[in-house]
């Protein structure tokens, strides 16, 4: 096929808050990659954190972006599960590969097949764009770090409860739904305004994370062997989740921030790598991305939450979206309209 004419929002150098829109890399998928024309791309905390204080060295100019929704335009030679024209979501992993072709903030991105999922026609692309990184991160916490049963449309009860701290967050929204689909009863935290949202995702009990007695309240409904996941990733939430795990006998605590220390001796905090399902634990990627997510979305048993806060205007608006998230949002995800596809 003819070469695709690409455009991208480039980070010209480290530690600058000014993306530059210009010609993007020409997609050339390997045998297991898929080229997606991006309709919408979501903004994640990683984008502004990498812009302000990179976790590691990169060669610049670079392109950010991990969450995309759009239409397949090209397939690698060994890709058999998908076809050109399908509506899909994709988890872009340029921070792993260090290749700008694998980034999300561009008109055409190249994504590994294991991190692509078909979406039903009933799900708007803008809503679908909130899912990729949150699904991968939640899956890593639940199935890599905690070794829970893989999700199913007809789960069997495990008799266990799991605390999802930050239930209305992007990762928390996916974690609640995956945990329920794995046969666990979910206990979550959220601000009072978001309790109904969190219950609609499947949480049986919701506690106000601001309540002074929240640890006591939650510990009273848990037993040794139950689980806790910190989906917020701040020093404060890590400390509170660590205290809660310690109160119920100890165990593994998946966290979204590097372990800070100072936790009870019976608590082992482990950092959750959202790239894991497509990088190391491919059985998790296959179980979640290839099997469960497409089936659950089609059956109406998985919601694309939180709702998107759409920023129209194309690639020129990516920096604006990053700045908006840097200032903070609640129960929403910033989604940039990259191109008009529906």
Swiss-Prot record:
Pfam families assigned: ADH_N (PF08240), ADH_zinc_N (PF00107)
Binding-site residues for NADP(+), renumbered to this chain: 46-49, 168-171, 191-194, 255-256, 329-330
Recorded GO MF terms: nucleotide binding; oxidoreductase activity, acting on NAD(P)H
Pathway connected to this protein: Secondary metabolite biosynthesis
Binding site for substrate: 133-140
InterPro entries: ADH-like_C (IPR013149), ADH-like_N (IPR013154), GroES-like_sf (IPR011032), NAD(P)-bd_dom_sf (IPR036291), PKS_ER (IPR020843), Trans-enoyl_RdTase-like (IPR047122)
Parts of the chain that traverse the membrane: none
This protein's UniProt keywords: NADP, Nucleotide-binding, Oxidoreductase
E.C. no: 1.-.-.-
Keyword Oxidoreductase: yes
Broad EC category: oxidoreductase
CDD domains in the record: enoyl_reductase_like (cd08249)
SMART domains: PKS_ER (SM00829)
Record text on subunit structure and interactions: Monomer.
Function summary: Trans-enoyl reductase; part of the him gene cluster that mediates the biosynthesis of himeic acid A, a ubiquitin-activating enzyme (E1) inhibitor. First, himA, together with the trans-enoyl reductase himH, catalyzes the formation of apolyketide chain, which is then condensed with leucine by the NRPS activity of himA. Dieckmann cyclization and release from himA gives a tetramic acid intermediate as the product of himA PKS-NRPS. HimG then catalyzes alpha-oxidation of the tetramic acid ring, with a subsequent rearrangement to yield apyrone intermediate.
Family designation: Belongs to the zinc-containing alcohol dehydrogenase family.
PANTHER family with a match to the protein in the record: HYPOTHETICAL OXIDOREDUCTASE (EUROFUNG), ZINC-TYPE ALCOHOL DEHYDROGENASE-LIKE PROTEIN C2E1P3.01
Annotated protein name in UniProt: Trans-enoyl reductase himH
